[in-house]
């Protein structure tokens, strides 16, 4: 007699790529602390250019992987050439159901700030955003030594701050300061 097999829904693999150590450690800590299921390639987070990010997205899509790409948009504002590349990348993947591009302006620190403060004010640069964040995380530092410890992420997760940040980020979408990291959080929380 033939064995009846149940159809078990398989979950598509989610892979996060990004451009810096802050993003790498943030998502690594979230995975560990909240039990999120995704993969991260640490070597893909160090000084990535837009070209390298795009190449990795294509490779992952060819493997039928859902891709979440996290980066700071201030990089594209520094030169017209970088801005054109970033605009082309966004346009290329804006309607792709297997890619979420999560940029933040000025930087990911704006996303962190939303965990503590309801703000959409314009920040001149990422340093200004970091100064505002230090009002809440006084020891915040972008060094590997600081980032590899998970205390700073634990502090942001306390009191359901991440849900509040998601609501605020969605509310302020398209403003002078914004972060689309809420899309990544929503996806990995499914």
Feature-to-residue mapping (PLM):
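C-terminal accessory helical subdomains adjacent to catalytic cores in phosphodiester-
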Residues: 2-11, 24-43, 54-66, 73-190
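Conserved beta-strand elements of the Class I
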Residues: 13-17
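Eukaryotic endosomal/vacuolar membrane-trafficking regulators centered on PX-domain-mediated PI3P pathways
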Residues: 46-50
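Short beta-strand/turn micro-motifs composed of small residues
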Residues: 18, 71
């Amino acid at each position: 007699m033939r064995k009846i097999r149940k159809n078990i829904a398989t979950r598509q693999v989610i892979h996060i790529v990004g451009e810096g150590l802050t993003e790498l450690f943030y998502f690594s800590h979230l995975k560990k602390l909240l039990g999120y299921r995704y993969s991260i390639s640490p070597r893909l987070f160090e000084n990535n250019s837009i070209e390298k990010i795009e190449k990795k997205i294509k490779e992952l899509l060819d493997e039928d992987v859902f891709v979440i790409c996290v980066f700071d948009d201030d990089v594209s504002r520094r030169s017209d050439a970088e801005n054109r590349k970033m605009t082309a990348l966004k346009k290329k993947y804006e309607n792709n159901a297997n890619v979420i591009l999560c940029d933040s302006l000025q930087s990911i620190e704006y996303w962190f700030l939303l965990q503590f403060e309801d703000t959409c004010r314009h920040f001149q640069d990422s340093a200004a955003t970091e100064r505002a964040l230090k009002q809440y995380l006084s020891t915040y530092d972008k060094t590997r030594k600081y980032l590899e410890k998970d205390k700073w992420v634990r502090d942001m997760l306390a009191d359901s701050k991440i849900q509040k940040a998601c609501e605020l980020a969605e509310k302020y979408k398209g403003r002078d300061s914004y972060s689309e990291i809420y899309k990544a959080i929503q996806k990995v929380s499914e």
